[in-house]
Amino acid sequence: MATSCESTVLKPDGKLNSHVKIPIAHPRSSSTIRFDPPKTHDMVRSLFDPTLKKSFLECCITATIIGNVILCYYAYQHLGANTTKIIFLSQYIFWRLSYNLGIGIVLHYQSHYESLTNFAKKHTLFDKKANNLLSRFVKFEISAKYQKGDSLYRYPEEWNTWLLFRQFVDLILMQDFTTYMLYVVISLPHNDILNNITSFNSIGIRVWLGVLMVLFNIWVKIDAHSVVKDYAWYWGDFFFLQDANLVFDGVFNVFPHPMYSIGYIGYYGLSLISGDHHVLFVSILGHCLQFLFLKYVETPHIERIYGSDSSDEEESIDDKMVKQLDNYSKPLVTTFLGFKNFDKFKPTDYITLITVASIVIGCTILNPSFVTLSKIALTTKIVSSVINMTILYKQSNSKWFTSLYLKNGYNEIYAYQMWQFIYNLHSTINYILLVLQCYYHFVKCDSGSYNTITFGLLLLAIQIWCNTEIFHSIKEFGWFYGDFFLPNLIDKRKLKNDGIYRYLNNPERVFGVAGIWGTVLINNFSNWNLWLATTWTMFNWFTVKFIETPHLLKVYGTKPTSSGFEKTLTKYKFGKDFKSLIDKVDQLLDDYLFTSLVPKQSVAEADREGDWESIINMLLIREQTVKNLQGTGHFNLDIVNINDENTIRIPEEIEIKWAVTNEAFHKDDWIGLYKVVETGEDRLTTKIPSQGHWSAVSSSSSYSEDHQKILHFDSNDHFTYGSIKFDKSILCFEEGIYEFRYHSANSHDVVMISKPFKLLFPQFKETVKDVDQLIATTKQFLKQCGVLINDNKFDLNRNKYFTGKTLQNWYKSTMDTDVSVVYMKRTNFDIDIITKKVWQIKQVLDNLE
């Protein structure tokens, strides 16, 4: 594309001129011949500016334009509107094919073989000595393009061939534009437009929207030409090259291929103004032909000359995973046309296929109403979105989903594959229900007009294109949020900035729901489709805003840079004001959602140590820990072996000293161990069972010996006192804040309560350095608890209070991770196997951070 560079160049007068900022060019076949291209003018100035010299072909082009206008008027007056439409529609098709097919073929051969340039050289068209008729005409024609004092003989054949090629391009493009515009003018409902242009009704809104689209189209063309100049406008790099790279500025920073994409938005604006579906279909045909020209002519040439900005050249993470991992294959991806990466040996792929078939067959057999199907589609979208967002949120913050599978004996790759299956299944179900819902509305309800249905399908096509471009850029790994599950596989911690991400940071926010809003048009603005589209958009926005963006900051250490659209928008004052407004609204939403809807961090979510300390202090302040509930006597219930931090480590025996007045004592008094949070506010009566965690205080009680853990018992004239122990046979093996309660006789009436204390597992996080040390520590702990047999096996029957859940909590306390009880059972509670698995999980999770 046209840029300037500093170089030493040979000026047309043959003198050496150093360090002048000018665009330097050279023929494609030779980089040694350097020349300074003379000034050229755009198509409109060349044809209609009376101050510029006109060539013979330019005069012919102007004459044909005037002739077509006269023909249109005459045909409309004498042959009628329908015949005139046919005449100019036929002309438009001819000139459009001349453009996309004719010029396309010429440029294809010029790109590959320089056919036009070689033809000019072979027939010496620009040779000063050549005197044949064709040479004289060609030299006469392009001599008008040079300023006075300049000569075509000072420039290489490539340049002169391009100038001649431009004349024929001007002829085809101007006739293409003129015949299309005349066809549209004839199709306009002039009376309807004039009568409703000032009214706020459907016709008035449609007309003004169309006018805005046409004006936007004009701006796109003007801005595009100001960026690429005549050099790229007329495909100059098919003939010669300038010392410059591809330019991404202005409108080229906003949309991919703006000359071919939004550069034709005026077509659809004119279709809206006319309200004629025939005009719309003709516009779509012309636009599709233009895209074919882009795909098969221009894009291959750009990639050949400038290289591709695609990431295809780099081996994707998915390709590396397939090569390096024996049990990994690319995930199933449901596309608009079917399934991609279907693996006949993966059961999950068949589940997705069977689900789709079941939904379609079920709807065919049951034949639900449109409203019923809409309710199902809306409910399914809400439920599946909440599930997906929950998984992603918890995975981002704590690797929850991966940990879930690791705990059950699977690896992190399998966990990621299961997420891929869940995500694709949800997407497939949502889209198949949406398609069926649209079909049922089309069949059973009033469908929209040809125009609304067609525009709805165009929005659907935009979403399909957007999804295709996103997938092409980020591949399967990005499509399935791979950086949430396997961030350790990312070699370069750099966000994508190519493909569609060059223009928009989050294209799925806008174009990713275009097709969903297209169903609103297709279903004639059905309320159910409005609800579906709004719900879809809301969940899409919420996922990007509150889950994806914070996670990207964690993984890549930075937020996405300003997109091309944002950079271009902020060049203009109204753009800066608009962005400022959006930022303020965004901040207000953040403040509202996080201060009003999201609850503040509760005590239960705080740090465990700080949390428990605050609860203990609260209990100590709220009431005395030793209470006289019988009168004014002296009562005492103390824990002997508690440390200064109010902590006892499992499975240490706990010794409790007690004392009550003789009047309050009964031989069947007993002491129970309870979690503070479970006893509630009632301090006079214990309303929950002790679950076997209790002991009698007197050997003369009527209780069994299993619950007589008496160390000492005595009395005097005033008091009865003693001590008991809570050993591993009646101790709790669950961490928490506990208290002892002294109960009167064989009842749950509370006589006194000990001060609360923390019951915790021993802490070895800092001392355990390898798996062998963890195995030894675990076995030692289990021996102390009396549940280890054969020096390697955990026995569930040794202590009914020490369960598989207890062992799971031990690992979690020691290593911040654990395995499921189901996995433990599969290993027959082999401590070596279980502990090695825990260590492996810990290493995997640490590696994923």
Swiss-Prot record:
Membrane topology reported for the UniProt record: Multi-pass membrane protein
GO terms for MF: phosphatidylethanolamine N-methyltransferase activity
Coiled coil: none
Keyword Lipid metabolism attached: yes
Alphabetical list of PANTHER family matching this protein: PHOSPHATIDYLETHANOLAMINE N-METHYLTRANSFERASE
Any Gene Ontology CC annotation: endoplasmic reticulum membrane
InterPro entries: Phopholipid_MeTrfase, Phosphatid-EA_MeTrfase_fun
Catalytic reactions on record: a 1,2-diacyl-sn-glycero-3-phosphoethanolamine + S-adenosyl-L-methionine = a 1,2-diacyl-sn-glycero-3-phospho-N-methylethanolamine + S-adenosyl-L-homocysteine + H(+)
Known EC number: 2.1.1.17
Subcellular location per the Swiss-Prot or TrEMBL entry: Endoplasmic reticulum membrane
Keywords attached to this entry: Endoplasmic reticulum, Lipid biosynthesis, Lipid metabolism, Membrane, Methyltransferase, Phospholipid biosynthesis, Phospholipid metabolism, S-adenosyl-L-methionine, Transferase, Transmembrane, Transmembrane helix
Gene3D superfamilies, alphabetized: 1.20.120.1630, 2.60.40.2840
Membrane side Cytoplasmic: residue ranges: 77-85, 189-199, 253-264, 372-375, 439-451, 531-849
Residue stretches spanning the membrane: 56-76, 86-106, 168-188, 200-220, 232-252, 265-285, 351-371, 376-393, 418-438, 452-472, 510-530
Organism field: Kluyveromyces lactis (strain ATCC 8585 / CBS 2359 / DSM 70799 / NBRC 1267 / NRRL Y-1140 / WM37) (Yeast)
Membrane-side (Lumenal) residue stretches: 1-55, 107-167, 221-231, 286-350, 394-417, 473-509
Function per UniProt: Catalyzes the first step of the methylation pathway of phosphatidylcholine biosynthesis, the SAM-dependent methylation of phosphatidylethanolamine (PE) to phosphatidylmonomethylethanolamine (PMME).
Gene, per the UniProt record: CHO2
Alphabetized Pfam families for the sequence: PEMT (PF04191)
Pathway where it operates: Phospholipid metabolism; phosphatidylcholine biosynthesis
Name the UniProt record assigns to this protein: Phosphatidylethanolamine N-methyltransferase
